[in-house]
Amino acid sequence: VITYAACGGALLNDYAPFAFGFAYIAMAYSVGNISDCHLNPAVSLACLIRKKMSLIEFLYYVGAQLFGGLFGSFLLGLCLRGYWGVLYSSIVTNKLRHPYKKDKNGWNRQDGWYYVDGLLVEFLLTFIFVFAFLGAKDPKQEGKHQGIVIGLSLILVTNMECYFANASVNPAKALGSALIEWFELDDPNNNRAIKQIYIFMAAPLAGGACAGLVYGLLAGD
């Protein structure tokens, strides 16, 4: 749903953060009572660290998330067949895209620091999102508004992330779309998503893990 509906909505209009946030809210109230609606390996890793799920459950969840990201990317591309190049140069795939190439001194921002920027942004925004998820799902919280809180948090981080790297904070979404781009685009020089996939896998997982550890320390459990 995140890859198919949210990315599809973001592709066809200028409101990408809302597409992702509303997609999560819809799923939270649809399947949240069944699976807690992680939809993101970084979230599942944080829950594993907090001992909210077993290792076997974690592997099942992550496997389903990765499959969902790949299948959703495939369906979206199938619905827009003939436009793979346009589709996967857009919000669907995660690539670093610094808003400027050089500063006033002529320093090229696409050197090594360009990738450090991406790693840092992915780490910090995933940390914020997963921390908000854990807080909203804490049993101490009362009410049934967790899905709205988490969806709004996703809108917040996506709003900033679109500026840097096409809005990921989700390894499953990033990997699925990158693999489809890799298989479908003829020009290997355009396959930047798969070449940069380590950023969108490692940084969100690290951010999710740190969020789980920090939340556990602050919550005293």
Language-model features: where?
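Membrane-interface helix-loop junctions and terminal tails of multi-pass membrane proteins
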Residues: 1-221
